Amino acid sequence: MINLNKHTAFKKTAKFFLGLSLLLSVIVPSFALQPATAEAADSYKIVGYYPSWAAYGRNYNVADIDPTKVTHINYAFADICWNGIHGNPDPSGPNPVTWTCQNEKSQTINVPNGTIVLGDPWIDTGKTFAGDTWDQPIAGNINQLNKLKQTNPNLKTIISVGGWTWSNRFSDVAATAATREVFANSAVDFLRKYNFDGVDLDWEYPVSGGLDGNSKRPEDKQNYTLLLSKIREKLDAAGAVDGKKYLLTIASGASATYAANTELAKIAAIVDWINIMTYDFNGAWQKISAHNAPLNYDPAASAAGVPDANTFNVAAGAQGHLDAGVPAAKLVLGVPFYGRGWDGCAQAGNGQYQTCTGGSSVGTWEAGSFDFYDLEANYINKNGYTRYWNDTAKVPYLYNASNKRFISYDDAESVGYKTAYIKSKGLGGAMFWELSGDRNKTLQNKLKADLPTGGTVPPVDTTAPSVPGNARSTGVTANSVTLAWNASTDNVGVTGYNVYNGANLATSVTGTTATISGLTAGTSYTFTIKAKDAAGNLSAASNAVTVSTTAQPGGDTQAPTAPTNLASTAQTTSSITLSWTASTDNVGVTGYDVYNGTALATTVTGTTATISGLAADTSYTFTVKAKDAAGNVSAASNAVSVKTAAETTNPGVSAWQVNTAYTAGQLVTYNGKTYKCLQPHTSLAGWEPSNVPALWQLQ
């Protein structure tokens, strides 16, 4: 039979694209489990992803991997079977195709919804490589991985499920106890059948984000924890029978949104570690040239208008996980083995932080993306490209003044700063995407040199520091409070203190004093302090300190005038833009608070604001209040009621119905979305367009 290469997406973003290839399927019998080996004694983990499609046109095979450079290989990707098919038909994705679920013999199988299945049976288990025979139980990439382990007994292999393109069914799987049970049982079956040492869930993303057509629901936050808990239960039970430790890991997003949409502290207690994807912070989806994986925040990026620059960097992403309760030893830092490019970037700043015409029209395999080995061979200080260094963000970049192309990437120098960060924070190691991008082993050699993997595993520190004592206020102004406290102790060592204003983190310091600024004059605040150690353990809170800021010097008690002429200037399905006439004040207006009903929606310094994250076709009522430096707040402006735009549907298109004959190409609407019929059929209950992508394609 003819099969199609199923993977066109790289690990986090749809911007990676691989063309489809026609492949011949090979039928092979089942596989005999290899003997279990002892867990490697590693002081740091070095986890490398190997994508199945590397063995196609990229011609980078498992045999090309140097197993001494990694401790774990994550094989990407397996998928989830649902209604007899897998894949993702979402037209916004890089590969909107589905296939029947198949076994290692490329035979169609009938399995329950939520079962883990091979992503590409031909390349996974069917293709013969040198030394293979036509009738051996398992061939393909998976057999090659097992051969690699036979000669390197400390190497571990992990099957990664999902990825950017194939995360469409995770929410459905996690939603019920029945499907969680199916998924967890199939994980055990998959590991035993193909001799993997663990399973890695790459769900992109719970609650929100990812491809538009992915299943998602608010309950994903709690359901993800339940799913992982069930997998852990099944893996531990299987491990007790098989005499080995089965690993469970996840790939996590690096944004504050991901941390808010998951129960990271609970997840960390379940999994062996978390691979945080600290890359893809900037790319061709925006027109401002910026860095793929900046280690530190660069204020110049914010000044140039780079979106979310203060949080879209490696340090902020990792710290967000630590602050959410992930122990440092369970956090493995992501490193990209590729760069991202833009075209039409002005020469100012050597192309950095410039408004460009768009993403690069060229790349190694996809436009806009450059493998590191390709950059080494053809770009770095070659062919008109000059290497520059951003010493704040700690990353290199290339600029070609002739063609105005800017490329952000990582090299051995920037990787060195990232490994130093790993050590300074006591993190568990490094993960990288992906092995075929570093064919000269330049970056792998750097990781291996900086992160020794042959020592004794230090015991996991789970002891929290003692509670900071005698928290007190030592200074107060109109806009700041200075606090002090007695030092905590720890079995290993205290690394710092988090200071909280109410429930919100106000600042983090390494000493026993802190000044919290930006407060409102004449206002009462309550502060507590928690100590932390290198493993990410937090102490209980100190005694609460309640203190009031002083009145503004000069006795300014006069509030600004109320804003006037509040009006809506634009509406979309999810946002409303407002404008108003400026207020006046005896000293000066410092900003405006915009309220959605009684809730504060945003604070701005100008006289316009856009409120996002709203529901379509819904009415909202807004008011605005002005404020000054003394903390005086005006009366509310006039109220304005505005309705967001409705979701657009195709006029004249009929709603989908049961027991109706449909022809190929016919359009219907279902749950507010438009679908095109792919095959003639008569509809039945359960064949709703959202459930049967083999029959319907979302428009």
UniProtKB/Swiss-Prot annotation:
**Which E.C. number(s) belong to this protein?**
3.2.1.14
Fibronectin type-III domain sequence ranges: 467-553, 562-647
Q: Which domain of life is it from?
A: Bacteria
Q: Do you know which InterPro entries this protein is assigned to? A: CBM5/12, CBM_sf_5/12, Chitinase_II/V-like_cat, Chitinase_insertion_sf, FN3_dom, FN3_sf, Glyco_hydro18_cat, Glyco_hydro_18_chit_AS
Q: What is this protein called?
A: Chitinase A1
* Residue intervals of the GH18 domain: 44-454
Please provide the record's keywords in A-Z order: Carbohydrate metabolism, Chitin degradation, Glycosidase, Hydrolase, Polysaccharide degradation, Repeat, Signal
List of catalytic residues: 204 (proton donor)
**Residues of the signal sequence?**
1-41
GO terms under biological process? chitin catabolic process; polysaccharide catabolic process
- The EC category is hydrolase
**UniProt keyword annotation of Repeat present:** yes
Q: Which gene encodes it?
A: chiA1
Family to which the UniProt record says this protein belongs: Belongs to the glycosyl hydrolase 18 family. Chitinase class II subfamily.
The protein's annotated catalytic reaction(s) are:
Random endo-hydrolysis of N-acetyl-beta-D-glucosaminide (1->4)-beta-linkages in chitin and chitodextrins
Specify where the region named Disordered lies, as residue ranges.
449-471
Q: Which PROSITE patterns match?
A: FN3, GH18_1, GH18_2
Q: Effect of altering residue 204 to D/Q?
A: Loss of activity
Q: Where are the transmembrane segments?
A: none
